[in-house]
């Protein structure tokens, strides 16, 4: 499960990797992207063209937003995503790709401590995470969840 990731590439590097123009969209580097943070993402428009947009991490289905106790859903398990009411519609119609430099996975070390491990490509180039998205409730933000596997 991905709970933090790094998005630290320059606008030029992201533009080149995505074959897209990001001019005017500069989010800056983040070495600790956490849920609700804004990051670059790519989606396909109805016309078939790709669009680079700013996405907010954490999908919040309408029925979840009415409860202050429930957190946005940051991950969706690929094995069951099409069966879960929170994700099924987004999985069918609204997919995205999120570029990242790497992500953190925590491993339990000893009795109570957990150690973060940074996972990245050997050549330090961008990696791409599959995601699903929905329009945020009450605003125009595009909320996303990262697809994970077991």
Q: Language-model features: where?
A:
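Short linear sequence motif anchored by a di-proline
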Residues: 1-150
């Amino acid at each position: 499960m991905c709970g933090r990731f790094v998005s630290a590439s320059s606008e030029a590097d992201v533009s080149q990797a995505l074959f897209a123009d990001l001019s005017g969209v500069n989010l800056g580097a983040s070495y600790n992207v956490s849920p609700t943070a804004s990051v670059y993402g790519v989606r396909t428009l109805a016309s078939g063209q790709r669009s680079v947009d700013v996405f907010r991490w954490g999908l919040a289905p309408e029925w979840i937003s009415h409860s202050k106790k429930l957190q946005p859903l940051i991950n969706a398990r690929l094995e069951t995503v099409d069966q879960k009411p929170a994700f099924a519609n987004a999985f069918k119609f609204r997919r995205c790709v999120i570029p990242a430099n790497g992500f953190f996975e925590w491993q339990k070390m000893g009795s109570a401590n957990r150690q973060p491990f940074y996972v990245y490509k050997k050549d330090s180039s961008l990696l791409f995470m599959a995601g699903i998205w929905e329009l945020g409730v009450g605003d125009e933000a595009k909320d996303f969840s990262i697809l994970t596997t077991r």
